[in-house]
Structures are given as C-alpha cells and as structure tokens.
C-alpha cells in the first residue's frame, strides 16, 4: 500500500518536507544536554531553517503559541531535566506543534499525566486539530479516552487491523476481549459513545476476594 498526505506520496517527500508536514511525539524523549522548555520547543522549527539562518521573531512567536496551546507557558524558562514527567510531556507535544504539521503522530501522549491532565491535553489537541485543519493520530491503550475523543478508531491485534470506524462501531465486547484478553463490558452513554469496564469478579467466576470477608 501507500500513504498520501496533502496529495503527495509520503515516500516521495524529501526529509525536510516530510519533517514540515509530519510531527511525531514518542513515548520517551531523551536529550543530549539540558535545555529550557522554550529552547526545546524551538527545535520544532528546525525543518524550516536554512544554512547560516538564525531563528526569526516568527519562530519565537510560534514557540510561545505552541507552549500556550498545551497549557505549558509557565514552564517556558524551566529546565527540562527539572520538571515532572507530565510537564515534560506537555512540552514535548508543544515542540511537535511548533513544526506546524499537517499530520501529528503521538505514541501514548497521556502516559505520564493524571486523569485531569489527560482530559485537558486531549481536549486541546482535538480543538487545535479542528481549528488548524490537521490530523491527529494517537496510539493508546486508554480505551475510554479514545472512545471519548476519537472520530475514528483503528483496533489492532498482533499486527493486524481488526476493525476501523467510529468508536460506537468498533467497541464490541467480543473484539475488545479478543485483543485485551480480559473480561470486559461495553456500555453506551447518552451521547452514543461507548465506555469500557472490567466485568465483575462474580460474573466471571472468581467469587469474592479471598482477602476480604464475603
């Protein structure tokens, strides 16, 4: 198969153009030397640089906006090795936004965030995608977060695609149990979006918890 982005085959794009159109946020991001948050986000402007080219005022404005978009403006002057994992994740996402991509790929972007921060980040990404007309693809094991925010879900199992579609179509108990190998229940809220929970112990034949009185 082939992948097209903005009318171009991605395999035919040179490295610089590909970096301008596609941004990636990995699970873990390492640094060779300490940087302040704004300096780290400024690296997202690298695909637009030229030989002997210094950062422009536009670059700094884009960095400032990217930090603001993920709620990380207060971290701008903080050193990356001195902030928490959740704060660092926000800054890493801001660097990707500074690339101003058409396609944003995120691998477990909520990994180090508490539940409130997860919701806030995903709400921001959904709003930004709508406002800026770019596509966000998120790899996640957070079933309920995916159901709450995704327009389309791709359910993968052992390297194969089992089903693609809106969460309400993809979230079928038998499919989810096949993938996650756990007894699950799927319920649908008033908005039609599914919610997944683990089936009760007694329902799956485990009885009461031996550590607790019956």
Regions found by a protein language model. Name each.
Residues 1-9, 18:
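Conserved ABC transporter NBD signature motif
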Residues 179-214:
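ABC ATPase nucleotide-binding domains
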Residues 100:
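Conserved catalytic motifs of ABC-family nucleotide-binding domains
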Residues 42, 57-75:
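Conserved ABC ATPase "signature" region
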Residues 104-108:
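Catalytic Walker B motif of ABC-type/P-loop ATPase nucleotide-binding domains
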Residues 53, 79-83, 87:
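Conserved ABC ATPase signature
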């Amino acid at each position: 198969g082939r992948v097209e982005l903005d009318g171009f085959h991605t395999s035919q794009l040179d490295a610089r153009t590909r970096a301008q159109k596609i941004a990636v946020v990995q699970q873990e991001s390492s640094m060779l030397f300490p940087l302040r948050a704004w300096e780290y986000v400024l690296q997202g402007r690298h695909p637009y640089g030229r030989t002997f080219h210094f950062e422009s005022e536009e670059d700094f404005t884009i960095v400032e906006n990217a930090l603001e978009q993920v709620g990380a403006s207060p971290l701008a002057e903080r050193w990356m090795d001195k902030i928490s994992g959740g704060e660092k994740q926000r800054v890493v996402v801001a660097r990707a936004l500074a690339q101003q991509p058409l396609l944003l790929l995120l691998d477990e972007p909520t990994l180090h965030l508490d539940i409130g921060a997860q919701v806030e980040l995903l709400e921001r990404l959904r709003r930004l995608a709508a406002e800026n007309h770019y596509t966000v693809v998120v790899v996640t094991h957070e079933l309920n977060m995916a159901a709450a925010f995704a327009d389309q879900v791709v359910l993968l199992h052992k390297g194969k695609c089992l089903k693609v579609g809106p969460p309400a179509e993809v979230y079928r108990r038998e499919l989810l149990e096949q993938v996650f190998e756990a007894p699950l229940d799927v319920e649908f809220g008033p908005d039609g979006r599914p919610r997944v929970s683990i089936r009760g112990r007694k329902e799956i034949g485990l009885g009461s918890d031996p550590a607790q009185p019956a």
